[in-house]
From Swiss-Prot:
Disulfide bonds: none annotated. Protein phosphatase inhibitor that specifically inhibits protein phosphatase 2A (PP2A) during mitosis. When phosphorylated at Ser-67 during mitosis, specifically interacts with ppp2r2d (PR55-delta) and inhibits its activity, leading to inactivation of PP2A, an essential condition to keep cyclin-B1-CDK1 activity high during M phase. Interacts (when phosphorylated at Ser-67) with ppp2r2d. It comes from Xenopus laevis. Phosphorylation at Ser-67 by gwl during mitosis is essential for interaction with PPP2R2D (PR55-delta) and subsequent inactivation of PP2A. Phosphorylated by PKA. This is Alpha-endosulfine.
Length: 125
C-alpha cells in the first residue's frame, strides 16, 4: 500500500508517514518564530533565576510590599514570643440559641424619653 510513484503522479503515504510530515510542518513555523525571537532578544532565557541584582536582593532576606505587611509580620513575631493563656477549652460558643426567658430582664430607664411623651400631649396639637 505504500506504493510511491515518481514523476507527475501523486505519492501515496501510509498514515504514519502522513503524521510525521504534518508534525514536521507544524513545528517548522514555531521554530522559525523562535529563531526570530532569539535574534531579536539574545539575552532572553539565558539565566533562569534572573539578573545578578535580583538574585542578590532575594538572598538578603524577606522584603515587604508595604508598611502594612511589615507591621503584620512584626506582630506575628511578637505573638510567638509572648506566652499566652489559650482559650478555655470548656467554653463552647454557638451551641445555644437564646430564648426570651434566657435573657436578663431589661432595666427600666429612670429618665423618661421626650419622644415617648404623654398620650394627652399628642392630642392637644
Amino acid at each position: 500500500m505504500s506504493d510511491k510513484y515518481i514523476g507527475d503522479s501523486h505519492l501515496e503515504e501510509t498514515g504514519e508517514e502522513k503524521q510525521d510530515s504534518q508534525e514536521k510542518e507544524a513545528v517548522t513555523p514555531e521554530k522559525a518564530e523562535e529563531q526570530k525571537l532569539k535574534a531579536k532578544y539574545p539575552n532572553l532565557g539565558q539565566k533562569p533565576g534572573g539578573s545578578d541584582f535580583l538574585m542578590k536582593r532575594l538572598q538578603k532576606g524577606q522584603k515587604y510590599f508595604d508598611s502594612g505587611d511589615y507591621n503584620m509580620a512584626k506582630a506575628k513575631i511578637k505573638n510567638k514570643q509572648l506566652p499566652c493563656a489559650g482559650p478555655d477549652k470548656n467554653l463552647v460558643t454557638g451551641d445555644h440559641i437564646p430564648t426570651p426567658q434566657d435573657l436578663p430582664q431589661r432595666k427600666s430607664s429612670l429618665v423618661t424619653s421626650k419622644l415617648a411623651g404623654h398620650v394627652e400631649d399628642l392630642h392637644h396639637v
